[in-house]
Structures are given as C-alpha cells and as structure tokens.
Design a protein with these regions (language model features):
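Catalytic toxin/effector domains delivered as secreted proteins or via bacterial secretion systems
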Residues: 4-174
Length: 174
C-alpha cells in the first residue's frame, strides 16, 4: 500500500509522529530538488544556474593548500563553522551530481569551470575564500572565480582565509 500521509510514513517507520512541546513535528524531506546527474548526461550549466544561488554574505570559495593543509573538505568545514556554503556543498545540497574533477578529461574541467563561473556571478555581499599559499598553475580561483567576483557589482568585499593559520586578509573592497 502506498504511503499517503506523514502519519502513514511515521507509523511504519517510527510507530508515531514525533512530538515537540505537545505539537506534532512535520517532517521535512532532505532534498526538495530532483536529481540532475551529469555523470549520466552532458553538462549544461543552465540546468543548475538557479540552484547555485546563495544568500548574501554566505558564499565561500577555495583553492590550494598551505603546507599540505587545505582543499575542499577544509573549506567546507570553515564555511559551515562561519554559517556559509561552498560551491561543492551547494551542489550536494541541491541534488546535483557533477563529473569527477579530472585534468585528463577536458569535459570534466569545463563543467567545473562553468559551474564555478555561474556560482561566482550570482553571489553577493561579503565573499570569503579559503586560499592556500600553494596554488596550481591555471587554478579556477585565480583564472575564473576571482575575476568574476571582482566584476560582480553585488560583491562588496572579498576576504581570503589561510587554511593552515586561519589568518584572514581583505583582498578586495567596493
């Protein structure tokens, strides 16, 4: 029998609807977005443009490492601790499956460059970036994201954060 109400779902799963302060708790499903899987179809940034928008003052970027410390996971952690999001956490939260980053697969590099570009053009307010002292030549931060952020009239300030020391430095202010 298909589940038709929240009560049906919770009666099967938990035995009752959860209650807080004597009021039923309405469950919120974890992802309201339908899955877009770019490992199964050609990348089209227009399909995800709307999903890559962020609230003002919440966008984080990342690039490079300092003494081996840095990368996506460190940036996600710092962003979360400061109430922000990264491109990757936004992608995860909106049910997008991107191709794995691979220098040897030009379509992978292009997909990530396009997603980064759209993310950077839609952010607003104060932007923070976890940027290490060791950056790969041709990195997306210096070549795509930073120029796009500086050209974005809705960006008021860009602050970098060293992934090892946590030292913050304002690099752009409007």
């Amino acid at each position: 029998k298909p589940y038709t109400t929240f009560s049906d779902v919770f009666s099967k799963v938990k035995g009752k609807i959860p209650v807080f302060n004597r009021k039923p708790v309405i469950p919120v499903f974890s992802n309201r977005y339908s899955k877009i899987d770019f490992t199964q179809t050609d990348f089209d940034v227009e399909l995800i443009r709307g999903r890559l928008k962020t609230d003002p003052d919440t966008a984080f970027f990342w690039s490079g490492r300092t003494d081996g410390i840095g990368g996506m996971d460190v940036a996600k952690k710092i962003a979360k601790n400061k109430g922000g999001v990264t491109l990757e956490s936004t992608i995860d939260d909106t049910n997008i499956v991107m191709p794995e980053w691979d220098f040897n697969t030009p379509s992978s590099v292009t997909a990530w460059e396009e997603a980064s570009n759209v993310y950077a053009e839609q952010v607003s307010g104060e932007i923070r970036a976890v940027v290490g002292s060791e950056l790969r030549p041709g990195n997306i931060w210096e070549n795509i994201e930073l120029p796009r952020l500086k050209a974005n009239p809705n960006v008021t300030k860009i602050t970098t954060i060293d992934p090892k020391t946590g030292v913050e430095k304002i690099i752009f202010e409007r």
